[in-house]
């Protein structure tokens, strides 16, 4: 009898220890998930507020709004009394209900420096990550997620086109044809390396003409004066 009581006591202690372990693991997992969701919420906010207006379309604005809705809903499941998240979710749902008539108030932010181009690349990387996570959550259908991943790559190309063009044009204004030639040459090489260069045939032709113009100016400046 005593042996049975001892065995039962040991089993009870093991069960209690296991339950405590499960409870602690659940708490840790919940805390980890909250940290991750708050980070995703912050990134969505950065995308909404700081993405350059010349690259933001109503469709993209709607996508970012939907991505933030997904994160808010998941966060609210963990913090049901979070009034700030509830209020933000109501605001986002009202915006999403407008479809592609959603207002786009992002001001244009010309890409004129390496630092600015790098900042926007980071935003695009964040957007790529948010799309991937939303697909993993089951919020975005796989086909839609793939389509938006392609669109992110397209926007990245547009970013480089604008950057190399602005860099070259600025150099021309400063009467630095050598620097302009280098910028336009970088743009031409970048477009030629794209998997589907024909998509950017018009932009490539434009940059090639600017490159030829800058090259002619460099050659003219190196001609000996008679």
Regions found by a protein language model. Give the residues of each.
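N-terminal signal-anchor transmembrane alpha helix of single-pass membrane proteins
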Residues: 1-37
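Repeat-mediated protein-protein interaction surfaces in helical alpha-solenoids
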Residues: 13-14, 129-153
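TPR-adjacent "capping" and linker segments in tetratricopeptide-repeat scaffold/adaptor proteins
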Residues: 28-31, 35, 144-163
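Residues that mark the junctions of alpha-helical repeat units in TPR/alpha-solenoid scaffolds
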Residues: 36, 40, 64, 153-156, ...
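Membrane-proximal, non-transmembrane interface segments of integral membrane proteins
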Residues: 43-134
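Alpha-helical junction/boundary sensor with strong preference for TPR arrays
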Residues: 71-75, 131, 138, 191-194, ...
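Alpha-helical linker/edge segments of TPR/alpha-solenoid repeat scaffolds
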Residues: 78-82, 95-107, 138-140, 206-226
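Long, non-transmembrane cytosolic or organellar matrix-exposed soluble domains/tails
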Residues: 161-226
